[in-house]
Swiss-Prot record:
Start and end residues of each stretch annotated as Disordered: 289-715
Source organism phylogeny: Eukaryota, Metazoa, Chordata, Craniata, Vertebrata
Name of this protein: Palmitoyltransferase ZDHHC5
Gene name per UniProt: ZDHHC5
PTM sites of type Omega-N-methylarginine: 617, 697
Reactions it catalyzes: L-cysteinyl-[protein] + hexadecanoyl-CoA = S-hexadecanoyl-L-cysteinyl-[protein] + CoA
Keyword line: Acyltransferase, Cell membrane, Immunity, Innate immunity, Lipid transport, Lipoprotein, Membrane, Methylation, Palmitate, Phosphoprotein, Transferase, Transmembrane, Transmembrane helix, Transport
A single GO molecular function term of this UniProt record: protein-cysteine S-palmitoyltransferase activity
Amino acid sequence: MPAESGKRFKPSKYVPVSAAAIFLVGATTLFFAFTCPGLSLYVSPAVPIYNAIMFLFVLANFSMATFMDPGIFPRAEEDEDKEDDFRAPLYKTVEIKGIQVRMKWCATCRFYRPPRCSHCSVCDNCVEEFDHHCPWVNNCIGRRNYRYFFLFLLSLTAHIMGVFGFGLLYVLYHIEELSGVRTADTMAVMCVAGLFFIPVAGLTGFHVVLVARGRTTNEQVTGKFRGGVNPFTNGCCNNVSRVLCSSPAPRYLGRPKKEKTIVIRPPFLRPEVSDGQITVKIMDNGIQGELRRTKSKGSLEITESQSADAEPPPPPKPDLSRYTGLRTHLGLATNEDSSLLAKDSPPTPTMYKYRPGYSSSSTSAAMPHSSSAKLSRGDSLKEPTSIAESSRHPSYRSEPSLEPESFRSPTFGKSFHFDPLSSGSRSSSLKSAQGTGFELGQLQSIRSEGTTSTSYKSLANQTRNGSLSYDSLLTPSDSPDFESVQAGPEPDPPLGYTSPFLSARLAQQREAERHPRLVPTGPTHREPSPVRYDNLSRHIVASLQEREKLLRQSPPLPGREEEPGLGDSGIQSTPGSGHAPRTSSSSDDSKRSPLGKTPLGRPAVPRFGKPDGLRGRGVGSPEPGPTAPYLGRSMSYSSQKAQPGVSETEEVALQPLLTPKDEVQLKTAYSKSNGQPKSLGSASPGPGQPPLSSPTRGGVKKVSGVGGTTYEISV
């Protein structure tokens, strides 16, 4: 009966149990009302006491057999039997006391039934040690309620026998009064008791045999152990004692409980969470705990609102407040950096945007270099279309920034003091400009019009190749793509950019330049160094050409003599500077000599006149032509001999700086001169061709350029 609470109500299944209860209670009531008072007078007053105790015992066992759980197994959940539902065999065999016992798969409850378990078709449940389904008690008889059913049968049989016997005794005492009410009622009760005694007594005897043999009604009816040995029997006495005296079996079904709603009154209200302490509940593998953290609600809300896939914050901007002279250029560098996003330029990692430049200079000059590199990064990344196209060719080579220091902003020179011996980009033309009073306006025009594409080429090639080649450091304009760089629109020049990547040999050479050998010689005049046209724009080249025309018209300075070995000298002195040598960017020209024996350190030679490397074009000067001669590539300068005044010991001391491998690179790297094949620039021209360089006479030197153009330079 406890199993049908959740199912549809069926009145038919309550008819047998209701009839049994009515007959039991009704007959006993009539017996106590009409028969027991006479028996107490004639026989003994203990008769009604006995019948009362027996009736109560019968009624108690009847109630227990009806309302008690017989031992129902709970059904498997849907997620528990997914794997076993369709692939399970019908039977499984287990061994109990050496006997094979089959377990059948229950498709309704979705598990293998244990031994002696069967599925009740009426209750629709699998019952442990299923005996039978009794309609008189409206319940299955199983392991948990079989004891009460068996006692009910025994007590009912005894009660029926007592009612029938004591009623017969009453009739015998009142045989003359058979028509009386008491005698008639006693005869009716005897008929009912006698009617139910036959089946009840037979059922009781059957179960006594089953208990003695250790079997169930289901096993006896189906004949499971009819021809064999019952593995579940323990002997007659043990079987009886197990049924009557053993402890009750556990209950597998939980008792249904209704959910209770508890209303919290004001003394039990939850306190508000304070800012100082927040309780966090943690659910991890079914374990609850409370973790107290000292965080404010505002901080927790911010943490929870942040997405897990949010981008990290940008890196902090550099603090330029402590550097003087940089605030004016901050807006320019920022605008140029933002304009690079829309251009098709080589990808550069963000970490290099504010990377300081490393050089071989002294420690005192590290801070100016780093600050200048921060601002000139955006300038050097501006690339015209021709540079972007030419960078795809395999012949593109990286070059360092070799622009003269005069191109830098004057504020840098005032704010940061550079070591003249450690700075490798100071040109000789700037020093001569200081001696001749070169105007600041022309410097500003050159700075605004000129450009240096090698700075960007070195940066772009760092992304492409990852390193700098030694020959490209020595010959920046040897690449055929250099002409395409100058043909494009010229961006603003970088402000004091210094290449942060220097090769080992270049660092060694600069170390030698920092500590040159000083030869105590007097000030002598020397030939001007060749002009580096590869780092200048078309406007500057045109200005230089105009300056050369002015030099031809002016008379030569007194005391200037031709010295063939001073063309490639890399060290000079300004008037009044004594013997303090200074390195210049034109010292790289000395490395271009085919023999590579020109020493890096030279005696101090004064320089007069306006410089060739910083000759600017005036306001009214005409625009330059489409082609400009590259005097730095003239064979007359590359074929000059070493200065005879330099001792042999100095050459031997500086000879290890250029190894035979470097000499081979120097020879092969200059197969082209001024963008022309080597055959056109040979030392011995064929008949009918003008010589590339003529001997110097009268302080005027003739130099032939591209296309047969001849230039006269006053020396």
